[in-house]
């Protein structure tokens, strides 16, 4: 009765990345930078390219070559210089950092990161306002680099500092990661303060396939601070969750959102979330950006002749 989906699949480029990208590129424009760019698993590529186009700045995207075609097409449509790196996200991230330093480019999630993360705080601001300034009991956040979870915590803390919220310390943060790229979950379950990188991520949730999460240690601190948990889910559980959300709420999410929903189900089954708790589940991207992941489990449409009798027989 108290489950809420924070649906960021309806933003300008159909993911939450419009929030941090918009802030970072606005600051790049303010600083007088001549070009911007990003290292990306897909969604940030689209968002950075779109906001750069609006700002009139050249954009350079560095991304693994195996991300979803829809995300590549989006970034290219906005006019980005798209560099498909034959390697992992961490390889693309390393190269983007080096290029940014050597050529004076504002890489939004690297040398513009302090401004970039501020944009994601609005995920806390909006949820608080939409819940009539009540703090939810549980927040489930899909985690790649970990920057979003950390920013959400910061956003709630700032609202408490200006007396718009109370009892923020009572909320529980849950980090959701896909099996095959869950270094933060692994560290949490081992009660370790160090995140050991995953060298070769292997998951259908490509937007979360960040083997060496830049904010991983901060996420572990936030989980400790907010009595949280970290949990993972496999590809089948992700696909099942995508279909569940689509069929019950009419929201078609990409696999990252499926990770949130799948982990929610697990936490309820494990008794870590009570059915009476108020729960916010973050859905961070649109399913149309990653249709390859879901097509294999969908029933193929049956092609029929344009005959009213035959078609009427299959419409119950």
Language model segments and positions:
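PLP-dependent amino-acid enzyme catalytic core
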Residues: 1-316
